[in-house]
Every structure is written in C-alpha cells, then in structure tokens.
C-alpha cells in the first residue's frame, strides 16, 4: 500500500499578506479589480459582473465601487494593509474604484496609470452615429 500523505483535504490555508498590488482594469463595459501579493499571486478579485450587476449597469462608477469594496474586504481578511494601485483603461469607474479601496481601510502607497498607449497600432473602432 502507498504511504498516506499527512495533509487532509479541504480548503487551502489563508496566508498572511501585509502588502500587495491592486490592478484595476476599467473598460467602458465593466470594471475588474484584482488584488495580488508582491510576487504576483492573486489574493482576491472582483468585477462589476460578479458583484451582481448586469448589462449596461456594469460600466457605471457605482458598480466599480461595489466591486472594489468586495475585493478589498477579501484581501483585508487575509491581513492586507498596504497596496499599490495600477489603473488601466478608459472606463468610468477608475477614480471611484481607487476611492473605494481607500474607504475600505487599505493604505494606498502608489497610484500608477498603466493604460497601454499604441504607437499607431490597431485601427480603432468606428465612431458611433446615434
């Protein structure tokens, strides 16, 4: 018979992570907040869609705030206190998401805009005619 391992089944142990990085990806249609530790392993994440918003409401600043609070709460449960914020994209929820992280009790040490800017890359979508 093969030797049994000592580890019992079940959920992974929560690790204590004092500081990390929050990536906020804000598009016109949704806002995704991912909080990772310093090495890049994801601690918690939330999006406007996972917070219960559907359709056009996912692109609103309030949906971004709700998603940000949800991700921050889960990260703080694992001991996170300080974060650096990387913001990407042109969406409406950028500032609101940052404010919600601060309001949840996380100390923001750095805010950096990492939106990719093309050096004349892909052709943009055609202008809307309403």
UniProtKB/Swiss-Prot annotation:
| Tagged with keyword Ribosomal protein | yes
PROSITE patterns assigned to the protein according to its UniProt record, in alphabetical order = RIBOSOMAL_S11
Residues of the region (Disordered) are: 1-21
Q: Which GO terms describe its molecular function?
A: rRNA binding; structural constituent of ribosome
Entries under Pfam families matching the protein: Ribosomal_S11
Q: Where is the composition biased (Basic residues)?
A: 8-17
Q: Which GO terms describe its biological process?
A: translation
The record's GO CC annotations read: ribonucleoprotein complex; ribosome
What InterPro entries does the entry give? Ribosomal_uS11, Ribosomal_uS11_bac-type, Ribosomal_uS11_CS, Ribosomal_uS11_sf
Keywords from UniProt, A to Z, are: Ribonucleoprotein, Ribosomal protein, RNA-binding, rRNA-binding
Determine if Ribonucleoprotein is one of this entry's keywords.
yes
Q: Where is the signal peptide?
A: none
Which NCBIfam families did the record assign?
A: PRK05309.1, uS11_bact
What assembly does the database describe for this protein? Part of the 30S ribosomal subunit. Interacts with proteins S7 and S18. Binds to IF-3.
* Role: Located on the platform of the 30S subunit, it bridges several disparate RNA helices of the 16S rRNA. Forms part of the Shine-Dalgarno cleft in the 70S ribosome.
Return the similarity comment: Belongs to the universal ribosomal protein uS11 family.
Q: Which PANTHER family match?
A: 40S RIBOSOMAL PROTEIN S14/30S RIBOSOMAL PROTEIN S11
Q: What is this protein called?
A: Small ribosomal subunit protein uS11
In which organism is this protein found? Acaryochloris marina (strain MBIC 11017)
Origin organism lineage = Bacteria, Bacillati, Cyanobacteriota, Cyanophyceae, Acaryochloridales
